[in-house]
Amino acid sequence: MNVGILGIGRYVPEKVVTNHDLEKIMETSDEWIRTRTGIAERRIADDTIDTSYMAVEASKKALEDAGISGEDIDLILVATVTPDRAFPAVACVIQEAIGAKHAAAMDLSAACAGFMYGMITAQQFIQTGTYKNVLVVGSDKLSKIVDWNDRNTAVLFGDGAGAVVMGAVSEGKGVLSFELGADGSGGKHLYQDEYVMMNGREVFKFAVRQLGDSCLRVLDKAGLTKEDVDFLVPHQANIRIMESARERLNLPQEKMSMTIEKFGNTSASSIPIAMVEELQNGRIQDGDLIILVGFGGGLTWGAVALRWGK
């Protein structure tokens, strides 16, 4: 059985915070932020919008895109590091909101790589015949765990949610290969205490090495080469990290998603948010070979070779 994406949706808050806005509250500049990260602005949720609200809105759009209802969903997986509370899970909030009365529901935590973990967990459940339709959501309100006095982290993050419905697709479409990995010895480099804490130098070194390597490994597993890749959707973390992955695949710039300028790093939601953007812009077409790749705290990483279409 081939398993792929049947529908996709996203939600981003209306409030835009630009680099110039940040100049007013901390010692930084638009030039400093753009040069080091590629970010110009990010969306920030106000106090009335929490992680579950964003997740529900993205889920509704994914269901609509898939042409199914909540009652058709068998399992809900939510990747988040900013749940509204320890329990109930964000997935359970979604279950009630979309009327998925037949669905099991749980959250998982793999930081910015969480969507990749959720996507492959869903694929495995579907491929074994356990479930038919699985809703996978990445949703994070990182603005609530960022120290707004720390220019090294505060400038990076935004809020948002992305969701996909996964199920059976035509032969040759969907997930062709994948890789998930973790290195717990690097957990000290990126973690949450009261706020997000990051050793930027070490995270950069890890990400530059791991993203490119993961892309090449999933291609090899699928019996494909760099020349077969039509589009790259990396986790939107840092322009220099993303460029390193693109260069490893010998792709031109127009073949890589770069939504970081508009949305910043939205953690587990960054890949589906970027995919929606590229679909709307017509840059992802039916039959395209897409590489999805992400990394996050843990340290964790994941990559998927995906043939787009149903």
Curated annotation (Swiss-Prot):
- Record GO cellular component, one term: cytoplasm
Top-rank lineage group of the source organism = Bacteria
Q: Which spans are transmembrane here?
A: none
Which EC number applies? 2.3.1.180
Which EC main class describes this enzyme? transferase
Any idea which GO molecular function terms this record carries?
Answer: 3-oxoacyl-[acyl-carrier-protein] synthase activity; beta-ketoacyl-acyl-carrier-protein synthase III activity
For the keyword Lipid biosynthesis, the answer is yes
The annotated region (ACP-binding) lies at 236-240
Q: Which residues form the active site?
A: C112, H235, N265
Q: Does the keyword Transmembrane apply?
A: no
Subcellular localization(s) per the UniProt record = Cytoplasm
Per the record, what are the reactions this protein catalyses? malonyl-[ACP] + acetyl-CoA + H(+) = 3-oxobutanoyl-[ACP] + CO2 + CoA
Q: Which Gene3D superfamilies match?
A: 3.40.47.10
Could you say which protein family the record assigns here? Belongs to the thiolase-like superfamily. FabH family.
Q: What is known of its domains?
A: The last Arg residue of the ACP-binding site is essential for the weak association between ACP/AcpP and FabH.
What does it do? Catalyzes the condensation reaction of fatty acid synthesis by the addition to an acyl acceptor of two carbons from malonyl-ACP. Catalyzes the first condensation reaction which initiates fatty acid synthesis and may therefore play a role in governing the total rate of fatty acid production. Possesses both acetoacetyl-ACP synthase and acetyl transacylase activities. Its substrate specificity determines the biosynthesis of branched-chain and/or straight-chain of fatty acids.
Subunit and interaction comment: Homodimer.
Its recorded name reads: Beta-ketoacyl-[acyl-carrier-protein] synthase III 1
Which gene codes for it?
A: fabH1
